[in-house]
Amino acid sequence: MTAIGLMSGTSLDGVDVALIKTDGRRVSALGPTGYRPYSDAERSLLRQALAEAGQLTRRDDRPGSLGEAERMVTLAHAEAAANFTAQHGIAREDVDIVGFHGQTVLHRPAQKLTVQIGDAAALAKAIRVPVMHDFRAADVAAGGQGAPLVPVYHRALAQSLDRSGPLAVVNIGGVSNISYIDGHETLIACDTGPGNALLDDFVLRVSGQPFDAEGRLAAQGQVDEAWVAAALQHPFFAAPPPKSLDRNEFAALALPKLTPADGAATLTAFTAGAIAGIVPLLPKLPLSWIVTGGGARNLSLLRMLREKLAPASVENADALGWSADAMEAQAFGFLAARGLKGLPLTYPQTTGVVIPMTGGRIARP
């Protein structure tokens, strides 16, 4: 079937769009990809919604700015999908399903609470295609972490690689997560810790820029190794997989007074150290690490990962013919296809749910 995936991640950069052809088990073709960036005003609204979401106790409540943010997210996704299909000459009749993740504003699996804003019914009416949404709720309700969801897609991609031995796919968005794949049977996944969120927030605060482009600011700085070592003592890092995080889990960690470059270098090293720290908790040492997400564009982060993970290889997913930028959008197209067929999206080894769980709900035009 033909599926389009839509993803707005915790980095708050914009909406990624991707088309894939899949039967929900294997990927037969990767189609075009697209991107609709958020404006500064839209990003500011999302940051406000994230701050206010910390007070939520029910997943359907939309107090304060959350209602306005939900409308904005829905319209942005409708615009992204419409522009994408028009640009690539894709008829809506040829699209079987759209996978719509929405925007996560709160993720507290211990409280069985995960909140993604975005009106799937309104989106389905706007684009006139069935929309699969609400991918995390069933897993969380059944006692799982509800994250990460992308590992089953990583496994499908890895099946096409001519590689022996275990490998790891690391997605570095607002939060970092890993998929450990060893053959067809072993799939282990978890969040590893911070991704770009802490760094992006810091860079915005000190420079007005939304992120550290290519890691150039961090490349000019010195890492405060003592601060990183102390931050890595957080109990999350010693817990075995599966485990997951809210975007703002480490927001309370205060950097000492550092220059912008030193602060960026230190937070980049924190992300790299957290990813490398998962290795002792895995069954075997991965022979290769494939990096996706916005972090794959951060050359300082890639350099630190290569230093910490040697002698294993560390490579950008683009080098394999995958898409580092559109990986999660592709994944939600894939997950929508799996959901349509009632196939599992999550497993005990990926989210801690007791039994393999399907998920997602359909909104029809």
Swiss-Prot record:
Protein's job: Catalyzes the specific phosphorylation of 1,6-anhydro-N-acetylmuramic acid (anhMurNAc) with the simultaneous cleavage of the 1,6-anhydro ring, generating MurNAc-6-P. Is required for the utilization of anhMurNAc either imported from the medium or derived from its own cell wall murein, and thus plays a role in cell wall recycling.
Pfam families xref list: AnmK
GO molecular function: ATP binding; kinase activity; phosphotransferase activity, alcohol group as acceptor
Record PANTHER family: ANHYDRO-N-ACETYLMURAMIC ACID KINASE
Species the sequence originates in: Rhodopseudomonas palustris (strain BisB18)
Keyword Nucleotide-binding: yes
EC number: 2.7.1.170
Pathway(s) per entry: Amino-sugar metabolism; 1,6-anhydro-N-acetylmuramate degradation; Cell wall biogenesis; peptidoglycan recycling
InterPro entries linked to this entry: Anhydro_N_Ac-Mur_kinase, ATPase_NBD
Signal peptide residue numbers: none
Single GO BP term: peptidoglycan turnover
Keywords noted in UniProt: ATP-binding, Carbohydrate metabolism, Kinase, Nucleotide-binding, Transferase
The protein's name in its UniProt record: Anhydro-N-acetylmuramic acid kinase
UniProt KW Transferase keyword: yes
Transmembrane feature ranges: none
Family note: Belongs to the anhydro-N-acetylmuramic acid kinase family.
Reaction(s) catalysed (UniProt annotation): 1,6-anhydro-N-acetyl-beta-muramate + ATP + H2O = N-acetyl-D-muramate 6-phosphate + ADP + H(+)
Positions of ATP binding: 9-16
Domain of life: Bacteria
